[in-house]
Amino acid sequence: MAGRTITRADLCEAVYQQVGLSRTESAALVEMVLREIADCLAKGETVKLSSFGSFVVRDKGQRVGRNPKTGEEVPIEPRRVMVFKPSSILKNRINGRTGKAAGRE
């Protein structure tokens, strides 16, 4: 059940339609928000958006992986990964649950 992909341009248009800023101002606003989120994540900070979810940066240590074709062991370097943890409100909305029943999980 794949839906449509929303792009930056779509977000800018939505801000333009709903907030009443000019298209240029709407695009600048969306870019500022996305840049701020990216800058915070690059510094290793968690970005929590109430009723939406949290973007969390995690450090993964070095480990040994395996080449699936040859079976040879390959070292995987330490790295940082970003994960998104949706809020329970967003999870309920995605699953079509609303109201009091949604809050009882």
From Swiss-Prot:
Keyword annotations of the record: DNA recombination, DNA-binding, Transcription, Transcription regulation, Translation regulation
InterPro entries noted in UniProt: Hist_DNA-bd, Histone-like_DNA-bd_CS, IHF-like_DNA-bd_dom_sf, IHF_alpha
Superkingdom of origin: Bacteria
GO cellular component: cytosol
Cited function: This protein is one of the two subunits of integration host factor, a specific DNA-binding protein that functions in genetic recombination as well as in transcriptional and translational control.
Record family assignment: Belongs to the bacterial histone-like protein family.
Subunit details: Heterodimer of an alpha and a beta chain.
Protein name: Integration host factor subunit alpha
Organism: Azorhizobium caulinodans (strain ATCC 43989 / DSM 5975 / JCM 20966 / LMG 6465 / NBRC 14845 / NCIMB 13405 / ORS 571)
Record lineage: Bacteria, Pseudomonadati, Pseudomonadota, Alphaproteobacteria, Hyphomicrobiales
